[in-house]
Amino acid sequence: MSKTVVRKNESLEDALRRFKRSVSKSGTIQEVRKREFYEKPSVKRKKKSEAARKRKFK
């Protein structure tokens, strides 16, 4: 979980920007989107295979 403490003489916008940056670096949003709905193992394998194929031919 990301935590951001507002520093002395720091605006709320700056603190929010630091919080958003730390959340995006930790990958929290992507993880939530990935786990939003159940994905069957066969579908996971298929997506993984397609991603590898896409990387290979890029």
Swiss-Prot record:
Top-level division of the source organism's lineage: Bacteria
InterPro entries, alphabetized: Ribosomal_bS21, Ribosomal_bS21_CS, Ribosomal_bS21_sf
Family per similarity comment: Belongs to the bacterial ribosomal protein bS21 family.
Entry's Gene Ontology molecular function annotations: structural constituent of ribosome
PROSITE patterns: RIBOSOMAL_S21 (PS01181)
Keywords noted in UniProt: Ribonucleoprotein, Ribosomal protein
PANTHER family named in the record: MITOCHONDRIAL 28S RIBOSOMAL PROTEIN S21 (PTHR21109), SMALL RIBOSOMAL SUBUNIT PROTEIN BS21 (PTHR21109:SF22)
GO CC term, one of those recorded: ribonucleoprotein complex
The protein's name in its UniProt record: Small ribosomal subunit protein bS21
Gene Ontology biological process: translation
The keyword Glycoprotein belongs to this UniProt entry's keyword annotation: no
